[in-house]
Structure formats: structure tokens, C-alpha cells
């Protein structure tokens, strides 16, 4: 990065900061951010990261790594003794009272929380008293945040530290039971087996993956907005295999003429054959996450992943493939792509105007990606390596799978933003495959 780049980043930071300031959140945004400001926040953070990289000296990097290493240890200690839950959400209390409730020495409590004050986590409003900050309060009301921290400190950090031992013993082995995690815990069983036996670790892994992949999710939204949605009119978009309504909630305000169906995956024993447009399987929590003014345009349904798509009149079938994880390795995800294509052949054949849009995370970081996207790709890849010796999606295999089909499905367009880590394939049914490939 040059000095000109530094000036450009500084200007973009100033512009983003002014936009956020105009929103009127004087207390900061730790408690949440309106959807329309999320791109502004990402721009601010991405440029700040670039400025930090340019301005830092090697000694600054050492100090930063030392600080975050200790902060992670402090957060783990708080989690182990459930200290955060011992502090009232809206008032300060003496350190002594918190220490008594948590059953920890007061002197240790004071020393371990004060480093966290430097990052806006907890605060000392008056001498000898501790209180929640806006940020730390979220770790009480949203337990998944603490689950992610505990997974990093208890499972991922020891695994990362064992990479040298793993390499000396197993080299470039791809066997799941030869991973750095196996070295760290002294187990001969693969990490996937641990997840089956320890629900707590499985829950923590899910929380960790949801937060580190958040920029991938933002990239899906960004990439999809580059597709040609305006000419669809009063059409229906089906989000196939959705884990949550977050993507359609993000898209709905941008395309007010569209209706959306959030189609979750049904269990074989839970009524998977019931009509897809019935609102069964919806939880109160998921419903509450949809803004009231959008609920009239968002409906719910379920479908077995192996079943043919029952919604016949949609204009777009949207399938978002996640990054590989210990629970869903790359080979399994490639099989899911093939399964999803097979499930939609009939509906696309009967409606040649309909499109299937398949989004996938990029398998490696590129120079054009912003800092958050590069970090998400690297974190996901390293986590997979350390825990299972697994690898990223092979985009060559995915492209071969899409190009070699003989059922009439053809990739009409490949779309991606240069700054994020998501690629989208627009697929339609064509009788003459050879003349319509991208």
C-alpha cells in the first residue's frame, strides 16, 4: 500500500464515520446496527485495517498479538466462572460482590477484567465498581458470543499450537484422525466423532463458524444484488435449504416487488411430504427476526433435500452453499451441489424462464478481496485444517460438475464482486447445451 492508498483509506474512513455519526447512535454500535448501515460499517472496518497494516511497525504487531492473546485468556476465565452473568446488566456493583457470587478471588477478578476495559468490554464507572459496557452486555443476552470465545480458547487455540507437532509426525496427511486437534488432545478419533459425543463442543463450533463466516454471508448479499432482479416484476424467489431468514430479510427491502419463500430442510420423520407452502416448522424466534413490515412478503416452507422441488411457479431458486466445516466437508458439499441441481431439473425444464442461482464461497483469498473477506476465507480454511485436515471447495470440480451436465441445465452467467469471497452461478434449462454456455 502506498501513501496515496493511505490518503484514500483515510477519506473513506472519514466518509463512513460521518454516515454512522448521522444515524444518532452516540453510544456506539456494539448492541447492533441497522441493516442499511452494515455496508458502511464494513467499509469503515476494512479501511481501518488497511491503515493499521500500513502504519504499523513489527514491534506494533508483536504488541497487538500479545494483547489479543491475553484478552482471549481473560475472556475464557470470565466464561469458566460465569462472571459476566454475576454483573447486573444495568448497574454497577463492587468487585467484591461479583467475586463472592462467582466464587473467585477479588484480586484475580480485578487484574483479569482491567485489560478488557481497553477494548470497551466491561467498565469501571467508579473506583472499586464494575459494570457492563454496551459490548459486554451482548455476551450475556447472546450466549452464542461467549460460546464462540470458549471454542477459540478451549479447542481451536490448542489445535493451532499443535500444528508443528502434527506436521513433524504426519506431514501433509489428509486423514481426519491425523489432525493438529488430535495431537493437542491425544485422541485417535476424528474431530467429527467428538462432536457427536460432546454436544457442548458442537454448539460452540456452530457459534464460532457463524461469526467468522459473517463476511461470507454479507458477500452473498452483495453478489446477489449484482444480479438482474429488477425485471422479475411480481415474482417469487425461493431460498432453498435456508438456515435462517437473514438473507431474504436483507434482499426484500431492496426489491419491493418480490415475494420470498424461505424453504428450510425437513427431517424425514417430521412431515417432509407436506405441502411446501404450509408454514410448518417455523419457530417463534425465527419469525421474530423478520421485521413486521416484511412479513407479508416472506413465507415459510420445508422440503426434504432429496425431494424434487415442489414449488413450480417461482422465478428464482436461490441456493447458498456454505464454506466447508468439520460437520460438512468439501466432498459432502460437492455432493449437495449435485443433489440440488438434480432436484431442480424438472421445475426448470417446465419453466424455461426460471433461474437457479447457486452461490458458493471462494476457495482461496485474492488480492482484490477486502480485508474482512480475506480473513474469513483464511480463518475458515485454517480451522478446517487444524480440526480435521480438511480442505476448501475445489472450484475446478464444481465448474466441471456444472459444465458436464447432460440434463439441460446450463450456466448462463458467473457473477462475483471483486471485493468479497462469494461467486454466483446463474443456471437455466436449455435444450441446446453447447450454444449457451458462458
Curated annotation (Swiss-Prot):
Gene3D superfamilies associated with the record: Vaccinia Virus protein VP39 (3.40.50.150), Winged helix-like DNA-binding domain superfamily/Winged helix DNA-binding domain (1.10.10.10)
SUPFAM superfamilies xref list: Winged helix' DNA-binding domain (SSF46785)
Leader peptide range in chain numbering: none
Top-level taxon of the source organism: Eukaryota
One annotated GO molecular function: DNA binding
Chief location category: nucleus
Domain (HTH iclR-type) ranges: 65-134
Keywords: DNA-binding, Nucleus, Transcription, Transcription regulation
Keyword Transcription assigned: yes
DNA-binding region as annotated in the record: 95-114
InterPro entries: SAM-dependent_MTases_sf, WH-like_DNA-bd_sf, WH_DNA-bd_sf
GO cellular component entries: nucleus
Annotated compartments: Nucleus
Biological role: Transcription factor; part of the gene cluster that mediates the biosynthesis of aflatoxin, a polyketide-derived furanocoumarin which is part of the most toxic and carcinogenic compounds among the known mycotoxins. AflS exhibits no DNA-binding capability on its own, but forms a complex with the other aflatoxin cluster transcription factor aflR and acts as a modulator of aflR's DNA-binding by decreasing its DNA-binding affinity.
Subunit structure: Interacts with aflR.
Entries under PANTHER family matching the protein: MONODICTYPHENONE CLUSTER TRANSCRIPTIONAL COACTIVATOR MDPA (PTHR43712:SF15), PUTATIVE (AFU_ORTHOLOGUE AFUA_4G14580)-RELATED (PTHR43712)
Record-given protein name: Aflatoxin cluster transcriptional coactivator aflS
Organism phylogeny: Eukaryota, Fungi, Dikarya, Ascomycota, Pezizomycotina
Gene for this chain: aflS
